[in-house]
Swiss-Prot record:
Protein name: Peroxisomal biogenesis factor 39
Keyword Lyase: no
Gene: PEX39
Species of provenance: Homo sapiens
Cellular-component GO terms for this entry: peroxisome
Subcellular localization: Peroxisome
Amino acid sequence: MERPRSPQCSAPASASASVTLAQLLQLVQQGQELPGLEKRHIAAIHGEPTASRLPRRPKPWEAAALAESLPPPTLRIGTAPAEPGLVEAATAPSSWHTVGP
């Protein structure tokens, strides 16, 4: 004896209807459309591939070789190298106070 079908399984349900996993399994087994699933029509194109718009990223060994070949950075007139901790102290909120000796 066959079980009576629920209205969601016999007719395509809307995208907002909630469907249980058992109902989804039943729809898949019957070859029916799944509710809320967008069907994409993807086809292979056998023509010329499109050109990349982004520049190629260097491989890690290429990036290391490039870094070694670049000249060392130079300072601009009127600037000094930052000492470690100096930048953090200058940008800390004024409500932060150091405590202790």
